[in-house]
């Protein structure tokens, strides 16, 4: 009956996928673009029947069932970035954390949270 997706990166990809499938008009009255929280919050309240967002946000949320990733071209990654505050009081520790986050050693930890590591 209804599909919810965010206004962020994953929601932009959903809207593009709907357009690529030529379903924009057909689904116009059935889609809800959320803001103000994860799609799963709205899904758990039954604001819509199907929710679409990044896997790491969808998994293990009470009141919802994670079904799986979208197929093929509909499953586009959302890029994440990291930065360092120039006035940081712990800049050495922050730089060490950033180096770890992009290291091969971090890959298994990231994958456990359904985040794909970068491919430098």
Regions found by a protein language model. Name each.
Residues 1-120:
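Exported/periplasmic ABC-transporter solute-binding proteins
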């Amino acid at each position: 009956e209804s599909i919810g997706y965010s206004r962020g990166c994953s929601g932009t990809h959903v809207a593009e996928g709907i357009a690529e499938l030529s379903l924009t008009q057909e689904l116009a009255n059935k889609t809800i673009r959320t803001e103000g929280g994860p799609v799963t919050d709205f899904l758990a309240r039954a604001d819509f029947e199907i929710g679409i967002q990044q896997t790491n946000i969808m998994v293990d949320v009470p009141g919802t069932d994670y079904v799986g990733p979208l197929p093929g071209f509909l499953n586009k990654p959302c890029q994440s970035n990291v930065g360092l505050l120039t006035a940081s009081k712990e800049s050495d520790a922050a730089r060490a954390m950033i180096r770890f986050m992009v290291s091969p050693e971090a890959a298994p930890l990231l994958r456990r949270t359904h985040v794909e590591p970068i491919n430098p």
